[in-house]
């Protein structure tokens, strides 16, 4: 699963799912032993949990980069490598 970004101890990854077109565009956020899965449109936590502070950071980052996340989703579903996305600073 390609890593798209890393910031404040959070790792953002996205899976290619060419055999599962029924899945909504989404990404995975990892922080220590926690995993949160976020849909892209609408942008919301759909599975898993993150500590509240990290959840707010991921949501702020995803709002800033929603178009890039959607573009990376399309690339992955076509078997192409996604582009890295700038982290929060």
What are these regions (language model features)?
Residues 1-23:
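Short, charged/polar N-terminal "headpieces" of proteins
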Residues 8, 45-46, 53-57, 67:
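Low-complexity, charged, repeat-rich alpha-helical/coil interaction segments
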Residues 15-53:
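A short, structured beta-strand/loop element
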């Amino acid at each position: 699963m390609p890593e798209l970004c890393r910031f404040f101890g959070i790792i953002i990854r996205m899976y290619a799912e060419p055999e599962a077109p029924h899945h909504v565009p989404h990404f995975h956020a990892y922080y220590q032993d926690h995993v949160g899965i976020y849909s892209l449109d609408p942008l919301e936590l759909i599975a898993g949990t993150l500590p509240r502070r990290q959840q707010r950071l991921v949501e702020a980052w995803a709002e800033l980069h929603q178009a890039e996340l959607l573009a990376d989703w399309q690339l992955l579903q076509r078997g192409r490598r996604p582009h890295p996305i700038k982290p929060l600073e």
